Amino acid sequence: MDPSVLLYNQLKAADPFFLLAGPNVIESEEHIMRMAKHIKTISSKFGIPLIFKSSFDKANRTSSKSFRGPGIVEGLKILEKVKIAYDIPIVTDVHEASQCEPVGRVADIIQIPAFLCRQTDLLVAAAKTGKIINIKKGQFCAPSVMANSAEKVRLAGNPNVMVCERGTMFGYNDLIVDPRNLEWMREANCPVVADITHSLQQPAGKKLDGGGVASGGLRELIPCIARTSVAVGVDGIFMEVHDDPLNAPVDGPTQWPLRHLEELLEELIAISRVSKGKKPFNIDLTPFRE
């Protein structure tokens, strides 16, 4: 059986959920290898299927002066080393159709950024790699849009797709998480993932001393969104994790501290075990009789 189909079936059958986790961006080979080692150790303790995440390029940074990563060539070499050294699947994002083919040679899951979730050419190019496609819901999109995005992948010949909630714009410089989306996105007929870290971004919400703005975030609310997501019954959790969030070069305010990863996962597993969120409630509307 095709490796992508095998992994996709494994993720669909994950109990209680699968995990996409890692630092936001590749900072160095040494750092990424160390993070992968620790995250795999923790996820293995709980028997949670892990897909290690990191980006080779942050193409939509608020400022052109901001750190973006090592680039596609060096970044993919590092991710491939992680994949081989720790025997874990990899997820990373693409920003242009031309990136899909080389990324598909390394990554097991190709992620479509939220800002690009409706870009047909990008979705089709990603789909044609045959890899699993994780589509993040645009901050500007209704959940129903994700059914169309997933269908674009399927019509390109790839049934291995999943969709990811990452918050909705709530005025300027803020996002809100609507738990109803986690249910409505099931209309896409594929696994639903909750991004519990980016959902708490405050885009361009932090003024810099030297002028300009950067994205802030509400890290302290990550457990709240995570608890809600597993109670609702999502199939997967996406979270960015860092060993030193205050000094992370990208999205530090929304990266979860590595030292608290085990503690949070333990709680989320306990919540998911008692929740019936993955089963629809059978509502009886016939008249009540004494």
UniProtKB/Swiss-Prot annotation:
Belongs to the KdsA family. This is 2-dehydro-3-deoxyphosphooctonate aldolase. Its main location: cytoplasm. GO terms for biological process: biosynthetic process. GO terms for molecular function: 3-deoxy-8-phosphooctulonate synthase activity. The lineage of its organism: Eukaryota, Viridiplantae, Streptophyta, Embryophyta, Tracheophyta. Keywords: Cytoplasm, Transferase. The keyword ATP-binding does not apply.
